[in-house]
Amino acid sequence: MRKIIIIVAVVFLIIGLSYFSHLNPNDQVSKPEKPINITFTGDVMLGRNVNPALYEDPQPFRNVINLTNGTDLTVINLESPITNSTNPRDKLITFKADPQFTKSLKDAGVDVACLANNHIMDYQEQGLNDTIKNLKATGIMYVGAGPNITEAYKPLIIDIKGKRIAIIQASEFADEYYMPPATRNRPGFAPISWDHIKSAIDNAKKAGADYIICEFHYGNEYRYTPNELQKNISHKCIDEGAFMVVGHHPHVPGGIEEYKGHLIFYSLGNCVFDMQNPETRRSMIIVVTIRGNTSIVHIYPINIIGYYPQLMDVDDANAFLDELEYYSNVEIQSKNGVGMIKT
């Protein structure tokens, strides 16, 4: 009898070992997802008065370097072509930056430059082509422009910590004479068009994107609240599966909207710029922490001193965050001059 019991026990042991040996160790203990931290800034313009200042101090992000160089990804709106071209477009205001200062962006931790805006074509197609060449040579990715509209609307795919991030970028402002967009046969930037945006979102999904971020150059200058086009496009993006929407162009910080559990930042304002109006010199840099289906956004209020950003002191930052909340439909918690939004 004892012998039978021993034999039965051995059989069950073998069966049990066989079962557990086929289990994937990763299935037995669920590991928490690693957070992904992404920094976003508003307009970075390295031309006009900023360009000569860069010869004196080539590190425009010196005072916020922990924000731009301390996360998994940093995304800026590059508001000036990087070119030596001497052939500007015939328009009132044109910007360009010395190509040597592309390195200033790389040294600051900039990973992605958004190119779809109303100044990227200031120095014609050559200016755009030079910008792309200089960014590539420095190891900075770009989105929102290209040799044709298909490439300009191509989602930028970035793999971070086992997750796939897709960035889609376009500009509201397109004009055949002053700021010509990309076409089927012409280089340029991606002009806002819902059909193209939806197609880009679909392509990002097909590419296996876990998080789709839409970034737009849109809105009215010096206006703190979104217009109907901004709201309509942003809501549609969320409806189609975008994780969040980030905007710039108004030169002032805009309101923040939570829509169906996702955040829309209608304007991050300026970051590196030479505008003198006090309202255009108060802005923010945001750091988005994504984990699973949730996000925590930290808002860092900045002042532009000279032409470069630096963090506000606590009292000014708290006042800024109170004002920002007034223009938003979200609660902004503040601690030590830093705002926080959870979704």
Region spans (language model):
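Acidic, metal/ion-coordinating pockets
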Residues: 6-7, 16-343
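N-terminal Sec-pathway targeting helices
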Residues: 1-11
